From Swiss-Prot:
The modification N-acetylalanine is found at residue 2. Keywords: Acetylation, Allergen, Lipid droplet, Membrane, Transmembrane, Transmembrane helix. Expressed in seeds (at protein level). May have a structural role to stabilize the lipid body during desiccation of the seed by preventing coalescence of the oil. Probably interacts with both lipid and phospholipid moieties of lipid bodies. May also provide recognition signals for specific lipase anchorage in lipolysis during seedling growth. GO terms for cellular component: membrane; monolayer-surrounded lipid storage body. The chain crosses the membrane at residues 50-70, 75-95, 96-116. InterPro entries: Oleosin. Pfam families: Oleosin (PF01277). The lineage of its organism: Eukaryota, Viridiplantae, Streptophyta, Embryophyta, Tracheophyta. It comes from Arachis hypogaea. Disulfide bonds: none annotated. Belongs to the oleosin family. GO terms for biological process: lipid storage; response to freezing; seed oilbody biogenesis. It is found in: Lipid droplet; Membrane. This is Oleosin Ara h 14.0103.
Length: 176
């Protein structure tokens, strides 16, 4: 059996750190040396972006000003109206409840009417699907029946005219 002294010695390689260093780029800094310029786009903004800014900033500013004025007016109005509401609350509360109930009733009636119309529309569409005919098909059928009836009436009128003519000739022959 082989012992540890019989074996050839093993060589172990040890790697020492090299002088090369991997730099992790930090935010806002480019290793290539471009500095802050690398953060900027290579070309300027497009014409549509410039127009959007020129239109958007004044419009947004105006709307912000109007919303601020609206908020200010609401706060002033609430500050003035609060004592009035407290003073007249025995009258205002029942009036608000009455108006609220009336509006709720009107909206409920409208919703019920709309639901009824939708149900009627659904039933009509369901019946059309059950019968397998649609309005254009029914109109074509009615047109064909009207044309057939017109042909029939025309033929009957022609037959009646010939019969009258035949009888008139018979009367003329018998009287001569």
């Amino acid at each position: 059996m082989a012992t540890a002294t019989d074996r050839a010695p093993h060589q172990v390689q040890v790697h020492t750190p090299t002088t090369q260093r991997v730099d992790v780029p930090r935010r806002g800094y480019d290793v290539s040396g471009g500095g802050i310029k690398t953060l900027l786009p290579e070309r300027g903004p497009s014409t549509s972006q410039i127009i959007a800014v020129l239109v958007g900033v004044p419009t947004g500013g105006t709307l912000l000003l109007l919303s601020g004025l609206s908020l200010l007016g609401t706060i002033i109005g609430l500050a003035i109206a609060t004592p009035v509401f407290i003073f007249f609350s025995p009258v205002i509360v029942p009036a608000v409840v009455t108006i609220g109930l009336a509006v709720t009733g009107i909206l409920t009636a409208g919703a019920c009417g709309l639901t009824g119309l939708m149900s009627l529309s659904w039933m009509i569409n369901f019946i059309r699907q059950v019968h397998g005919t649609t309005v254009p098909d029914q109109l074509d059928s009615v047109k064909r029946r009207m044309a057939d009836m017109a042909d029939y009436v025309g033929q009957k009128t022609k037959d009646a005219g010939q019969e009258i003519q035949t009888k008139a000739q018979d009367v003329k022959r018998s009287s001569s």
